[in-house]
Design a protein with these regions (language model features):
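Conserved short-loop catalytic and cofactor-binding motifs
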Residues: 10, 32, 44, 66
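Thioredoxin-like thiol-disulfide oxidoreductase module
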Residues: 33-51, 77, 81-84
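Structural micro-motif
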Residues: 48-57, 67
Length: 84
């Protein structure tokens, strides 16, 4: 299973929803809190081209935010990505 990384902040409700969805599916992930260090946001922009949160990566592939994660989950494509 590829690594899943969630870039988030403490004040973002969509970040909480994304992490909750991953938890409910039993998908392990690493959470990177952008509040901890401003350099993390620069790294996020470099990796994804976006500065909004949450941003979710599966392996080194950015998939977007909570809406994209939910759509992948509902379509069954999230399981496919994680099985690769």
């Amino acid at each position: 299973m590829p690594d899943v990384t969630v870039y988030s902040t403490t004040w973002c409700p969509y970040c909480d929803r994304a992490k909750r969805l991953l938890d409910q599916r039993g998908i392990p992930f690493t959470s990177v809190n952008l509040d901890d260090d401003p350099r993390f946001r620069s790294a996020l922009v470099e990796l994804t081209g976006r500065s909004t949160v949450p941003q979710i990566l599966i392996g080194s592939e950015p998939i977007g935010g909570f809406s994209e994660l939910r759509a992948l989950d509902q379509s069954g494509k999230l399981a496919e990505l994680l099985a690769a």
